[in-house]
Amino acid sequence: KKLALFKNAETVLLPNPFFSFEKIANVTKKEDLGYLLLVSGLGANKDLHTAVDYYFSIPPEKRIPLKILGCGNGVDKVINIINGRDLNNQIEVIGFVSLNEVVTLYSNAKIVWAHSLAEGYGRTLAEAKLTCKNVLCTRISAFREQDDVNIYYYSYYSEFFKNYSYLIENPPHVVEKTLREHLLFETELRKIYE
């Protein structure tokens, strides 16, 4: 009765892309290869220019390598944003990669970083939980909805550096677990089908 819209369908598929990410994450080795993974994009909300400025605000002796993921075919645009500041070749801009490669990048990061002015949902944070990584992120409402022991917020440079420094010295506090979203999804499906 609740699925009347689909009454003529033989099959109803309700996709959830996190299940694919989680399935791969569950069989991917988690390591700390010592890099900061910035999951970003080129949209205005991602504020990539400011994120790169934050990275270069870290004193050089405390800066770990940075990998920037999520800009697809905009690698050249990201290199222009970096604008010759990467004198020690510590930044790698990653173009399009497979989901397996994305999960591996998360799984091997020291810290996952999500810098944004606005999001509809904190996907990067959810994915970091699935790979048992600490997250450094801007204090925006979509990210605060993902609050957990592995999430460290910042609103300004000094807070960014304080949390970055803490995370460099401390291992992740997260254990493998099911996302709250998965539990809610399963609960709602039970309501529909029971």
PLM regions with names:
Residues K1-A9:
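A short, active-site helix/loop in glycosyltransferases that binds the activated sugar's phosphate group
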Residues F18, V39, P65-I79, G95-F96:
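Glycosyltransferase donor-sugar binding loop
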Residues I79-N100:
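Nucleotide-activated donor-binding/catalytic signature segment of Leloir-type glycosyltransferases, i.e.
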Residues V97, T104-A109:
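Short alpha-helical donor nucleotide-sugar binding micro-motif in glycosyltransferases
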Residues N134-C137:
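Short hydrophobic beta-strand element within catalytic cores of glycosyltransferases
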Residues N170-E194:
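A charged, aromatic-enriched C-terminal amphipathic alpha-helix characteristic of glycosyltransferases
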